[in-house]
UniProtKB/Swiss-Prot annotation:
This is Cyclotide vpub-B. The lineage of its organism: Eukaryota, Viridiplantae, Streptophyta, Embryophyta, Tracheophyta. Disulfide bonds join 5-21, 9-23, 14-28. This is a cyclic peptide. InterPro entries: Cyclotide (IPR005535), Cyclotide_bracelet_CS (IPR012323), Cyclotide_sf (IPR036146). It comes from Viola pubescens. Keywords: Disulfide bond, Plant defense. GO terms for biological process: defense response.
Length: 31
């Protein structure tokens, strides 16, 4: 992913995964 979703995933998974975001380097990115 290259677009930051404005969410971290250090302690919990990406809630924004419902819109296509995934965790990378402790930050949620959209592919």
């Amino acid at each position: 992913g290259i677009i930051p979703c404005g969410e971290s995933c250090v302690f919990i998974p990406c809630i924004t995964s419902v819109v296509g975001c995934s965790c990378k380097s402790k930050v949620c990115y959209k592919n």
